[in-house]
Curated annotation (Swiss-Prot):
The lineage of its organism: Bacteria, Pseudomonadati, Pseudomonadota, Gammaproteobacteria, Enterobacterales. GO terms for cellular component: cytoplasm; exodeoxyribonuclease VII complex. Heterooligomer composed of large and small subunits. It holds the Pfam family Exonuc_VII_L. PANTHER family: EXODEOXYRIBONUCLEASE 7 LARGE SUBUNIT. It catalyses: Exonucleolytic cleavage in either 5'- to 3'- or 3'- to 5'-direction to yield nucleoside 5'-phosphates. Belongs to the XseA family. This is Exodeoxyribonuclease 7 large subunit. The gene is xseA. It comes from the Bacteria. The keyword Glycoprotein does not apply.
Length: 456
């Protein structure tokens, strides 16, 4: 009988799939060292082999797109270091690893240490560009930290002598290979900084295997290069060799000879540049002098043309011509003026105003007499008309009537009273007499009855 809660039941396919997923996701990519056995390479180009140690073994596969990057031919019994993904071949339930990269065991371990140290120093910021110091341009003294018997020193000195023989070089001899090499390299860098004799350092050696170059993958050397106040150029091995020192240094040169070229000036090239510059300066000077000479000649010619004596002579000649022209013009002007005066005198004599003035005076006297007579006659007639008008006006003037004892009475509204019905008792009246006005109040009104005429 089954229990009340049945356990999960896997099919074989599901079991293998679950195990494969667990292996791939939980384990991920790992490094494995071991001995190769049962190595085969079918026509497909893939590699199939077993990786084992003294007590266990595991099947491995390395596909063609991965094994083409391996630089050696794996041999039976060879110790190797592989980077692989763990998986399960589901159809048969075979546990195996898929190899991505392979190295001989010795170099593989070193490469693993290299990658770990590189990641650590990069995380600490030793590779950051902000810490890179610029190289002096030009360098006044070069320090070389390398083996005093190695080919690297010979190459560096040869290039420096060829390019810049006058450049001082200070050698700090040190071992570049072996257990003591990292410590000696560190002390040489510190000594160069203490003495402060150089303004740039070349740290390097010639080519070799990964083990030969391992001193320059040492963390102590990397820290010393980073702490150096003097700019450091790394020159380790060949162009394909890349060490930790290359990442930390202020500049990486592919070879020691290239490092020497970087820190030195090419005196032959400088000499050619100086000669070229000298030729350009000479040509420019010749052109400048020729131009100045031509300009000087022009100015000198102009000065000769503008000499004071020449100018004075020209002005004197011009003055004489002007004097002659002025004298001739003055004589002609006086001659024309005399002729004009004679003509005007003749015209004046012909147009003598005395007879006209006499006739005009006689005419004026006649007109004055006639004007006086006319004015007297008009004045007499006007006086007569004025007298008649005054007499007529006096005859019809109200003042004359008032003078005979009559008066004119007006109401308060200014109207002349003609009948008693125009006023009422109590009203004020104004009366105009010959010599003034009289104001009076109406006390009583008595109209006069008119008698009717009998008609026969």
């Amino acid at each position: 009988m089954l229990p009340s809660q049945s356990p999960a039941i896997f099919t074989v396919s599901r079991l293998n799939q679950t195990v494969r997923l667990l292996l791939e996701h939980e384990m991920g990519q790992v490094w494995i060292s071991g001995e190769i056995s049962n190595f085969t390479q079918p026509a497909s180009g893939h590699w199939y082999f077993t990786l084992k140690d003294d007590t266990a073994q595991v099947r491995c596969a390395m596909f063609r797109n991965s094994n083409r990057r391996v630089t050696f031919r794996p041999q039976h019994g060879q110790q190797v270091l592989v980077r692989a993904n763990i998986t399960l071949y589901e159809p048969r339930g075979d546990y195996q690893i898929i190899v991505e990269s392979m190295q001989p065991a010795g170099e593989g371990l070193l490469q693993q240490k290299y990658e770990q140290l590189k990641a650590k120093l990069q995380a600490e910021g030793l590779f950051d560009l902000q810490y890179k110091k610029p190289l002096p341009s030009p360098a006044h003294c070069v320090g070389v930290i390398t083996s005093k018997t190695g080919a690297a020193l010979h190459d560096i000195l040869h290039v420096l002598k060829r390019r810049d023989p006058s450049l001082p070089v200070i050698i700090y001899p040190t071992a570049v290979q072996g257990d003591d090499a990292p410590g000696q390299i560190v002390r040489a860098i510190e000594l160069a900084n203490q003495r402060n004799e150089c303004d740039v350092l070349i740290v390097g050696r010639g080519g070799g295997s990964l083990e030969d170059l391992w001193s320059f993958n040492d963390e102590r050397v990397a820290q010393a290069i980073f702490a150096s106040r003097i700019p450091v150029v790394s020159a380790v091995g060949h162009e394909t060799d890349v060490t930790i020192a290359d990442f930390v240094a202020d500049l990486r040169a592919p070879t020691p000879s290239a490092a020497a070229e970087v820190v030195s000036r090419n005196q032959q090239e400088l000499l050619r540049q100086v000669q070229s510059t000298r030729q350009r300066l000479e040509m420019a000077m010749d052109y400048y002098l020729a131009n100045r000479t031509r300009r000087f000649t022009q100015i000198h010619h102009r000065l000769q043309q503008q000499h004071p004596q020449l100018r004075l002579a020209r002005q004197q000649t011009m003055l004489e011509r002007l004097q002659k022209r002025m004298s001739f013009a003055l004589e002609n002007q006086l001659k024309r003026a005399g002729q004009q005066q004679q003509r005007l005198t003749q015209r004046l004599n012909q147009q003598n105003p005395q007879p006209k003035i006499h006739r005009a005076q006689t005419r004026i006297q006649q007109l004055e007499y006639r004007l006086a007579e006319t004015l007297r006659a008009q004045l007499s007639a006007t006086r007569e008309r004025f007298g008649n008008a005054v007499t007529h006006l006096e005859a019809v003037s109200p003042l004359s009537t008032l003078a005979r004892g009559y008066s004119v009475t007006t109401a308060t509204d200014g109207k002349v009273l003609k009948k008693v019905k125009q006023v009422k008792a109590g009203e004020m009246l104004t009366t105009r007499l010959e010599d003034g006005w009289v104001e009076s109040e109406v006390k009583n009104i008595q109209p006069i009855k008119k008698s009717r005429k009998k008609v026969h």
